[in-house]
Swiss-Prot record:
The protein's Enzyme Commission number: 5.3.1.-
Reaction equations catalysed: 5-deoxy-alpha-D-ribose 1-phosphate = 5-deoxy-D-ribulose 1-phosphate
InterPro entries: Deoxyribose1P_isomerase_DrdI, IF-2B-related, IF-M1Pi, IF_2B-like_C, Initiation_fac_2B_a/b/d, M1Pi_N, NagB/RpiA_transferase-like
Superkingdom of origin: Bacteria
Protein name per the record: 5-deoxyribose 1-phosphate isomerase
GO BP terms, alphabetized: L-methionine salvage from methylthioadenosine; pentose catabolic process
Active-site feature positions: D240 (proton donor)
Organism: Clostridium botulinum (strain 657 / Type Ba4)
């Protein structure tokens, strides 16, 4: 069984290599990128997906923009960089890691504005690589914190893909699963298929299966059943953005899972890199929710599954109320309610 990585960097050829997640699990193919425009398309078309992976990819995308930016003076260079940053930021509006990574790249350019533009381009290359490596370290630390809340023999339910395929490595929600596997634990994972794009069955189930982890795929409407049968001891999901009060935007269907978990008395854990926490967003009502193409709902594998022309509502995300969340687990530690107070403390450390 092979390790699947969503993002690879070819240092010798200066190319970003992304796993095409739109054709999984039927084919495993990688696509090479070396332009900001290509990176934009990869994010928009969900070749790469998952908030952390999107952020890392965008950082490389802005480096590619910097490579072809004007070199006559810093002002013209930075103007071009800002334009391309806004362009990349528009590819997926919900994932806060996207704007976070782009702002870091912009700040790094400003910090070095007195240097030669050619030198700044090299600095941005190294900064994108640093963001990539940092994501790996963050994911492992999240797993190390999460595993303290679990025990051998645990049954875990997860929704969508907050796994290795959504990050640089380990994943967020799946990180404790990989670490538990290394420890020799016996445990089971139930993966919601996650309509309409099926990330749970095509991505999460695939990567866990390839890693030799005991994973069972269920349809989204089976979650209540497996909870009622005492198969689930913990729900662990990722996030795309967390508001200051703890409200959490994640893949559509997560809110429903949280309601079920609360009803059955099952702890609901959010695996969250700190870049996904947006202290400037007061509540979940302030988080922009992306609406996606209607055909994601009405057709599958080239076959119509609903009447052509029928009205479709297809939000890509929903917001889990903070009241339904047991803890938010970050690389810096575990955050318990009251979230508005304790999330602030997290950034004071």
């Amino acid at each position: 069984m092979a390790e699947l990585l969503a993002i690879k960097w070819d240092d010798n050829r200066d190319k970003l290599i992304l796993l095409d997640q739109t054709i999984l699990p039927n084919k495993i193919e990688y696509i090479e990128y070396d332009t900001a425009e290509g990176v934009y398309d990869s994010i928009k078309d969900m070749i790469v997906r998952g908030a952390p992976a999107i952020g890392v990819t965008a950082a490389y995308g802005l480096y590619f923009a910097a490579k072809v930016a004007p070199e006559d003076n810093f002002e013209n260079f930075f103007k071009y960089l800002k334009e391309k940053s806004a362009y990349l930021d528009s590819s997926r509006p919900t994932a806060v890691n996207l704007s976070w990574a782009l702002k870091i790249m912009e700040s790094k350019a400003l910090e070095n504005k007195d240097k030669d533009v050619k030198e700044i381009k090299g600095i941005l290359r190294e900064e994108a690589k640093r963001i990539h490596e940092e994501d790996i370290e963050i994911c492992k630390a999240i797993g190390e914190n999460l595993i303290t809340l679990l025990k051998d023999g645990v049954g875990i339910l997860t929704h969508c893909n907050a796994g290795q395929l959504a990050t640089s490595k380990y994943g967020t929600a799946t990180s404790p699963m990989y670490l538990a596997k290394e420890k020799g634990w016996n445990f089971k994972v139930y993966s919601d298929e996650t309509r309409p794009r099926l990330q749970g069955s095509t991505l999460t189930a695939l990567e866990l299966y390839e890693a030799g982890i005991d994973v069972t795929t269920i349809t989204d409407n089976m979650a209540a059943m497996v909870m009622s049968q005492d198969k689930i001891d913990a729900v662990i999901v990722g996030c795309d953005r967390i508001a200051a009060n703890g409200d959490t935007a994640n893949k559509i269907g997560t809110m429903g899972v949280s309601i079920l978990a609360k009803y059955f008395g099952i702890p609901m854990y959010i695996a969250a890199p700190t870049p996904s926490i947006d202290i400037n967003t007061k509540t979940g009502k302030d988080i922009p929710i992306e609406e996606r193409n209607s055909e994601e709902v009405t057709s599958r594998f080239g076959v119509w599954t609903a009447p052509k022309g029928v009205k479709v509502y297809n939000p890509g995300f929903d917001v889990t109320p903070h009241e339904n969340i047991t803890a938010i687990v970050t690389e810096k530690g575990i955050v318990y309610p009251p979230f508005e107070e304790n999330l602030k403390k997290l950034f004071e450390k």
